Regions:
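Positively charged n-region of N-terminal signal peptides that target proteins for export
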Residues: 1-5
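Bacterial N-terminal signal peptides
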Residues: 8-21
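Sec/Tat signal peptide C-region and signal peptidase I cleavage site
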Residues: 22-26
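Asp-box/BNR beta-propeller blade signature and adjacent active/binding-site loops
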Residues: 28-395
Length: 395
């Protein structure tokens, strides 16, 4: 199933165990820009569960944490097809203490939303040692009840709840109560309790050199009526409170969502955005003034979504993204230090053996000076979705 642009985007776009190496193909297609594929790994797979939308952080002690969404594999229960909205979708976590060679077999529960399913846990390792994880949710209501809600975003009988954040101060073993961010300025989507939905996003926020957190969120506002756009929120207290800063991207035709943010050595904030109504092209917007404003968005010149940008030891940037067109898989580019060569950077095929377009959503971390791990969700032959990874050698 192809994830609808509004189904994460939530409301914005519908509208749109022990492990081992499992695949060594495509090695001849890597090696570009000093990046070489070593092997693919299965990080977590259970045929009873649909596992998807991971993120990864490397703790100061070297431990790796992978968070992901897990829901029942509904096809095993006799239901038709799969869905990205499920009342039993929870946020889970697995660990590795040996640089990804083995992973904990029994996943730990991060959070179960009391009002519905939880989505896309997006972790960031903060400099104070804590981990901040953003997510969002959907509530399942009876169809007649959902239909009565004013200005709600619906996906069938599901109603969008908006976003929230979770914090752990002990390496992901325990998580504090949810932090509810404010609605985006001008938000027109209301939740089931009659209030504008809290800010939300699927993608990486970043901690700037100034210590502040920068978070690009998706929103359906009155800025461009009916069109999802993106906006910047900033936190000066490690994510406890957030202030609206400025619009990031809006357009009368193109919708934007699922944004990952990256700060370059010169302090430029680069927003890598998923699009709809734009032939699946990546869009990019830049802020040259520490998030006070963004220049007009631009076409990056290639297809793929969503994205994660990882700084390499030499300060170049590894940009990874899902590829939901035949051949389905995971791709990457190595950008210069200021991310200025988007269109000209050679595309690196990490995987092209996916069973359908329902895959991707990669995240990455460095393991050492010359090794990186990219994690994502994957399927073979349209089988049960699982969390996989690709180990890279970096020259």
């Amino acid at each position: 199933m192809r994830r609808n642009s509004f189904a994460f985007v939530l409301p914005i776009l519908l509208m749109t165990g022990l492990v081992g190496p499992v695949h060594r193909g495509l090695a001849a297609q890597t090696g570009s820009a000093g990046v070489r594929k070593v092997e693919d790994l299965i990080i977590y797979k259970d045929d009873k569960f649909y596992s998807s939308f991971p993120s990864i952080v490397r703790r100061p002690n070297g431990e790796l944490l992978v968070a992901f969404r897990r829901a029942p594999e509904r096809r095993l229960l006799g239901e038709h097809g799969i869905t990205h909205t499920d009342p039993n979708s929870y946020l889970m976590l697995v660990r590795s203490r040996d640089d990804g060679k083995t992973w904990s077999q029994a996943p730990e529960l991060i959070y179960a939303n009391p009002f519905g399913g939880s989505q896309d846990p997006c972790m960031v390792q903060l400099r104070d040692g804590s981990i901040l994880c953003s997510s969002y949710g959907w509530a399942l209501l009876q169809t007649n009840a959902a239909a009565k809600l004013k200005d709600a975003f619906r996906h069938g009988s599901f109603v969008f709840l908006g976003g929230y954040l979770l914090r752990s101060k002990d390496g992901g073993h325990t998580w504090q109560a949810p932090i509810i961010p404010p609605p985006t300025s001008g938000e027109t989507v209301f939740g089931p309790f009659g209030q504008p939905v809290p800010a939300y996003n699927r993608g990486a926020m970043c901690q700037g050199k100034d210590g502040r957190l920068y978070w690009v969120v998706a929103s359906k506002t009155s800025t461009v009526p009916g069109k999802p756009g993106t906006h910047l929120l900033i936190s000066s207290d490690q994510g406890d409170t957030w202030s609206y800063s400025c619009p990031v991207a809006a357009d009368e035709k193109v919708a934007f969502s699922e944004t990952s943010l990256y700060e370059t050595p010169k302090g430029t904030l680069v927003a890598f955005m998923r699009t709809a109504n734009f032939d699946d092209h990546t869009a990019v917007a830049r802020s040259m003034d520490h998030g006070k404003s963004f220049q007009r968005w631009e076409d990056a010149g290639f297809q793929g979504h969503p994205h994660y940008a990882l700084q390499l030891p030499d300060r170049r940037v590894l940009l990874v993204y899902g590829y939901r067109h035949p051949p389905f898989g995971i791709r990457a580019r190595v950008l210069d230090v200021e991310c200025a060569n988007l269109a000209s950077a050679p595309e690196i095929v990490l995987r092209d053996d996916g069973g359908s377009g329902d895959l991707g959503y990669p995240w990455a971390t460095m393991l050492s000076k010359h090794r990186a791990l990219v994690v994502y969700y994957f399927n073979s032959g349209d089988g049960t979705r699982h969390i996989a990874g690709t180990l890279l050698s970096i020259d």
